[in-house]
């Protein structure tokens, strides 16, 4: 089994992005699966092509994209990607879309094929906080989540794909009082646990357990 794991470069006012820093530190093999690591730019109009080229070259069984979610306390496997770009800030190319449909011939939303409940459970069992999330936002994280799902729908039907957000690093919250942070070691531990869950649930679907939210 081969798993492509992507992480974004820094964006906004931050000089570091825990996503790519954690991805770079993953082992090359987890639970018998080969791990292919890829840095992608935080740019709406470029990121999808970078991932598409990697999928075409590597032919992975799974794609797991990692992104930063400042303000969240836990690692959060994402349930659904929506067909909308609505940038709160400019991306790294200076582009800021407003209520922009990603693909006119795409679905309004795509649900992940990853076992997100099993992933959240495995992360918590590794001693790292985790919860299933029902919104990946409308910035480049949701964009690449949706784009990979669109690729699966139109071009790469055999892959399974999804997205997971991770919190700020401690050094990112020095001037952000009361903002949650998680160490890079815990990020790596949590992502590794999530990948182990992906491998162990391959061909079995997700586990049946409560991870829903009221709001």
From Swiss-Prot:
GO cellular component, one term: cytosol
UniProt entry tagged with the keyword Lipoprotein: no
Top-level EC class: hydrolase
InterPro entries documented for this protein: Peptidase_C15 (IPR000816), Peptidase_C15-like (IPR016125), Peptidase_C15-like_sf (IPR036440), PGP-I_bact-type (IPR029762), PGPEP1_Cys_AS (IPR033694), PGPEP1_Glu_AS (IPR033693)
SUPFAM superfamilies on file: Pyrrolidone carboxyl peptidase (pyroglutamate aminopeptidase)
GO molecular function: pyroglutamyl-peptidase activity
Gene3D superfamilies found in the cross-reference section: Peptidase C15, pyroglutamyl peptidase I-like
Active site positions: 78, 141, 165
Enzyme Commission number, as recorded: 3.4.19.3
GO biological process, one term: proteolysis
Keywords, in A-Z order: Cytoplasm, Hydrolase, Protease, Thiol protease
Chief location bin: cytoplasm
Catalysed reactions, as listed in the record: Release of an N-terminal pyroglutamyl group from a polypeptide, the second amino acid generally not being Pro
Location in or out of the cell: Cytoplasm
Entry's family note: Belongs to the peptidase C15 family.
Subunit record text: Homotetramer.
Its biological purpose: Removes 5-oxoproline from various penultimate amino acid residues except L-proline.
Protein name, entry field: Pyrrolidone-carboxylate peptidase
Organism: Lacticaseibacillus paracasei (strain ATCC 334 / BCRC 17002 / CCUG 31169 / CIP 107868 / KCTC 3260 / NRRL B-441)
């Amino acid at each position: 089994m081969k798993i492509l794991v992507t992480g974004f470069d820094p964006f906004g006012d931050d000089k570091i992005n825990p996503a790519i820093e954690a991805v770079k530190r993953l082992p090359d093999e987890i639970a018998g699966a080969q791990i292919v690591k890829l840095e992608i730019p935080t740019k709406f109009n470029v990121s999808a092509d970078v991932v598409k080229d990697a999928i075409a070259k590597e032919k992975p069984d799974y794609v797991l994209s990692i992104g930063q979610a400042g303000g969240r306390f836990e690692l959060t496997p994402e349930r659904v990607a929506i067909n909308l770009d609505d940038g709160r800030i400019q991306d790294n190319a200076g582009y800021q879309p407003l209520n922009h449909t990603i693909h006119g011939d795409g679905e309004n939303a795509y649900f992940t094929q990853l076992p997100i409940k099993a992933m959240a459970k495995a992360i918590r069992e590794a001693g790292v906080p985790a919860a299933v999330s029902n919104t990946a936002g409308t910035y480049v994280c949701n964009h690449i989540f949706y784009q990979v799902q669109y690729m699966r729908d139109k071009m790469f039907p055999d892959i399974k794909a999804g997205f997971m957000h991770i919190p700020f690093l401690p050094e990112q919250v020095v001037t952000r009082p009361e903002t949650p942070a998680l160490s890079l070691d815990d990020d790596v531990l949590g992502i590794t646990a999530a990948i182990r869950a992906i491998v162990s649930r391959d061909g079995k679907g997700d586990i049946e357990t409560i991870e829903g939210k009221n709001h």
